[in-house]
Amino acid sequence: MKITFLAPHIRIAGGARAILTYADRLARRGHDVTVVVPAKRPWRAFWRNVRRRGPDWIPGFRARVRWVAGWDPARLPKADALIATAWRSVDAVARAPANAGTKFYFVQHYESLYHGDPAKVDSTYALPLKKIVISSWLQDIMRERFGSAAEVLVTPVDRDLFHPVEGARSDDALRVLMLHHDYPWKGVREGLEAMAAVKVRHPEVLLVGFGVKRPREALPYEEFHENLPQERLAWLYSRCPIYLCPSWDEGLGMPPMEAMACGAALVTFDNGGCRDYALDGETALVAPRRDVAALAQALERVVTDRLLRDRLAERGRDFVTSRFDWDRAAERFEGVLS
């Protein structure tokens, strides 16, 4: 098949990682795959095409990257499948000619919540594009709010990258790891409040933050790791026995899954997307959305109960590494497109 993805960028951040991994794996399965990416200026698109700039974080990337000044429906390549990957790319897909391929919408979050005008974003979900979503929560939203069917393909963890790293826990310190992000809906404020409540009774527990950038203000992280390369993330996840996810809403949530694959016990809000892997009392402890007191209580349980912590970590690791697999996911993606 000839397959075209419209990707917002090729950085490792956010949902682009899944988009480009699928593009690479489909190309490795013998398909002719093009990823069309907008540049801010026409001259940038020109030089990036000349230099064949692609995602250098995927060794030997097999798909073709085509840089453009903007997504022009009339200039999209002829293909069998054309895939929008965010709400801003949907208009180009919807208006593309028939020879651009069967039209799909790869949905990785309910973007109406935080990304763009809600009415405009919602209008994209109502369009008659075949939908692929990354969680059961998103499938429910598509069905209940828009009367639209969707195929669920949970994004797997890369087991070659994310696994327990021997020697990472070089001391007996009990570390809680949390992603730091400027988006309010990532729940940093709620996470800090929950951690502060636990530290009143357990001051020995250490809060470890990580993120693309350091926080602008002084926050109570005992450690902070800035913009770690992906090969070092497994070490950080493995170093911290507990992963705290205070996000209000997630399309899926890859960092919690990566931490689980590295042997961390997960404590999380019920953020929607986590329901495919965070099974309360089995693979994680789950608190009601934005209920800081409940999140603190769950965190304290994992801090004080070593047997519970180890059981959640073991079951969580087994679940995310056996239930979701990249080879199977690429095969299913291929089947949906065909």
Residue ranges of model-derived segments:
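Short hydrophobic beta-strand element within catalytic cores of glycosyltransferases
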Residues: 265-268
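Aromatic "clamp/platform" in nucleotide-sugar-dependent glycosyltransferases that forms part
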Residues: 248
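Conserved acidic donor-binding segment of nucleotide-sugar-dependent glycosyltransferases
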Residues: 227, 280-281, 285-292, 301-307
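Short alpha-helical donor nucleotide-sugar binding micro-motif in glycosyltransferases
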Residues: 236-240
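A short, well-ordered alpha-helix in the C-terminal region of glycosyltransferases
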Residues: 294, 301, 308-322, 332-335
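Acidic anion/phosphate-binding donor-loop and adjacent secondary structure
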Residues: 112-118, 144, 151-172
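Conserved donor-binding/catalytic core segment of Leloir-type glycosyltransferases
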Residues: 4, 132, 168-186, 192-197
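Short glycine/serine-rich donor-binding loops of glycosyltransferases
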Residues: 253-256, 274
